[in-house]
């Protein structure tokens, strides 16, 4: 493979034994595809498919008036260009959205004649109507809602369709399995069928009161006869004068115990009474030609009649269907001359009489009576009129407006009831209901299997697009009602469509969904990995999903169908465990919303390169081998038996039977888990913590690539959108810290477009978690780029790879108890070198409002503040950028009018003399919070339309315009240079008819002449050839056009910046100040590795006291070795060994460079590193210069990749260690034979430790749980209103709770005075508190405890119960 520009700088040595068959897909594909399909903005209106917005409009329109003579039709919709781009929306606090305009027709009909009912079109009015704003997705797959970045999480919900299950014997004490079925539509009423312990079958609608299922069957038009015919086969009898004859059916007799002697037609006894009928008996009966068997009278009694029996003479019904035979009934039948009789066939084993028994409990007589019963159940208390009854029943399951199975539901339904085809009506039919009841009865009879609701074939994913569409539909449905009401008026009044449609309900529905839905979440932006994971999250919670409290263990557990679809490792700890999952690396969604995963096709034991994506249901049909199955050179499976999966179970099968094979060993895990090296050696619980904590790593000042990675780092960084990648290839024309200008290759430049790409980099931008988003260029001027190359690194990336921590030299050893219980000991050098220093950006906002007493003002003129306190504010009262501020410093001066107070005579006099004084305003300035300090890095001022801008606001606008003009000038410069190059090529050597500097007619134009003429005068040259003249003219026109378009763009930008800002109601001016806070590593900060090995920094030790090696190098971090064995995360030990090898190899390369070794020598050593084991790298693509520059990048350590489940073996680590540390070097460093341990020396005494210590490099992270954010202290502060006790929590500046158990402790010590103080003056004794304050001021230290306020609250509580309680003071 060819190396990209960025990869050439540093190649990661991979130990993967298998080449990738399938590249890791774009990780945000699911989100972006779903929303693109919802909007269909780049599809011509006529070509749009019926999904997303198009489907929502189609479902709501046409709207017809009540009398049917006015109709509103939908034609098409268009999306307007958003008014502000993403960055502008973020700074102004707006929503990045596009206006939807729908073209609708208002059609008014007329009657053809006064008598006829047929209609003719009277007039048609067409108009574009505003239909609310739809938020747009950014390039990174997120949304900007009110200025904050949010993510819509996909939802995993139960797929529509029909499901069969049983209660696992939990309902009834006998442990009997009660079967049930449920038809779940996408929209509409749920229909449940369930057996009760007496084996009667009931149904219920929307979990209401249950009713016998026969009522529903009658309501869909079945008679008792047809119900029985549908569920039972019949036994045919012939009535004799005494007894009867039964038709002989061998299958029904076999296995039964004879209740009487069974004889053949000759009268010979074949089966004696009380004997079991066997296959031999039935064969004998068949051979004797027996068609009927004589049965005694009592055999008939209790049998159930299958059809109505009618008296042939009178037409009277003697016996109704489902009636049991009795002696008197048989007598009646004989006397009426009835000979043939049909009874339903039932038995105890596999043909229960459930439907027959249910039918007997039901008293309704016909279809209408059944529907009335259903109406009464749905609408108790309402009178059942015929129209209302029929309308309700139609609306329940047969009306497309109220019931929608959806395409998925119909597909699942048909598959379940065994119908061919995946399509059909979206409402239920009578056959559907009957089919479900039949399957349920079969289940009770022991045929078939129940569904597993946790199977991913029964759970589907609802994506952003679908969720947004549902909201838009809701909004349209609300509009539909309002429009229907008003359509009648359109006949009389000349109304246009926009008079009828009010878009507010749509905007409200979308606003509520994007702003407040449980699935619309504040984006986790701590680092790039957190962003990507958040967008790939799949949640079972949310509207229409599960709730935490109701979700049982089964739903949360890992299911076999999660393989390759949902990660078995990454899920939160705590109440949401298993309910929130992460999509696996290669997983994608199919058209129905089910998760699919890719497999390679295997034919006759040979693995092909064909790849099929299988859903969970399809996968169950095949035998699938694992990705690590051994193959020979031709790609055939080796060995007689291959480890494979069949129907979810792991088995060994012969190679010929294998039909598919996994595409990659990492296929089963998510992005975060696939970034953990040696994941296969970690316990799953610790791997879960490791994956979760990687997302909490804070971006540090100088990101450093992980020495030991997995090879997914680059994909994750690029797909997260944190790094800047080249959209087109070209040459870097200009680079500075804020922008990169690329001149695009001619081949990739589009004709008529500017061949320049300008990448403006993000500088010190605040993320949602207050971390710092910052991009740094990694290209130089003149570099050649290809499309997709990384041109700038972002937060937590290093040369285009994710880098969330630092490589630290780790020693596993105890050190004076400072690493007890997972504490971490840190070398002071780490802090001094700022290895874990991070920048956090805080946004502080102040608003000047219009109050009743007058407008607040942002000003420098603040009462009672000294000049020193104001010295950093400019004349507008806003702090300068670059000022370093401490707690309590004024950032923005603001004064608020005070209420009128009664003035003393003296004040009145002063006022009369000096006019209005500052006493009528109070200082409400924005100050730095307690406990935070930092540097002001940016200020933004927003002013309401119509209010004079202050100087500072104007200055900010001017700076922004200057920056924008610079961009345009750069583009113009490159375009002009390109144009003049083309002109030079065009004119050189041509004949001219004349031109500047008295160019003679017929003279040849040469380079010397062109160099002597001002470039802009080249257009005045008159070439002799017409074609050349035309080309020159077209170049001139295109240049002028480009200039004109740039001027327009600048004008538009200026207009945007100078127009007033949209601010909340009553706000005149808003100032945002951004503070950058540097956080150094300190005791109390939480740190972790990638294997779930977390801990808290306990002490920062001077370099000279740390344990050191024989060559004097000291450990960066000392960890407790007891943290490894019990937690079973051995991956960290292997990572340490391999990291140690990487560092050693880097040092060897550094030594070679220092000794100025030849490039060929360095190349040979690199060949040994990269190509002696593991995956081979083609270093011949790099020339000598590139090899040396790559060697320079490798001096800090050679990066390794050990892919998940396909990583470096122990032997490979050993080989690398021996290559990195030859004998002489190992001795110099005091390493053991294995090179994995070293003898260390105590920094304080210089003595050698007795035993060798495991030492090496691990990628260690600083997590976003910083002691500075958690540390909090209070002396006095706010108190709760009712109880007068101090509030709790840092946010409320609260106190520490001295709870019940702490009181017990003081009681146990007998510390009476301390206890009294705790419960009174330090808590809620209001009088006592003030007295203590007074005594402290006076220098006395006496305490007078009074009555705690909470006692008074208790007394009041008791009184409210009507008990008169009083405190008697003695």
UniProtKB/Swiss-Prot annotation:
Keywords: DNA-directed RNA polymerase, Nucleotidyltransferase, Transcription, Transferase
Signal sequence residues: none
Any one GO molecular function term: ribonucleoside binding
Keyword Transferase: yes
Reaction(s) the record says it catalyses: RNA(n) + a ribonucleoside 5'-triphosphate = RNA(n+1) + diphosphate
A single GO cellular-component term on record: DNA-directed RNA polymerase complex
GO biological process, one term: DNA-templated transcription
Record has Nucleotidyltransferase as a keyword: yes
Family annotation (CDD domains): RNA_pol_B_RPB2 (cd00653)
Superkingdom of the organism of origin: Bacteria
InterPro entries: DNA-dir_RNA_pol_bsu_ext_1_sf (IPR042107), DNA-dir_RNA_pol_bsu_external_1 (IPR019462), DNA-dir_RNA_pol_su2 (IPR015712), DNA-dir_RNAP_su2_dom (IPR007120), DNA-dir_RNAP_su2_hyb_sf (IPR037033), RNA_pol_bsu_bac (IPR010243), RNA_pol_bsu_CS (IPR007121), RNA_pol_bsu_protrusion (IPR007644)
Function: DNA-dependent RNA polymerase catalyzes the transcription of DNA into RNA using the four ribonucleoside triphosphates as substrates.
Family: Belongs to the RNA polymerase beta chain family.
Assembly: The RNAP catalytic core consists of 2 alpha, 1 beta, 1 beta' and 1 omega subunit. When a sigma factor is associated with the core the holoenzyme is formed, which can initiate transcription.
HAMAP family linked to this entry: RNApol_bact_RpoB
Name of the protein this chain belongs to: DNA-directed RNA polymerase subunit beta
Encoding gene (name): rpoB
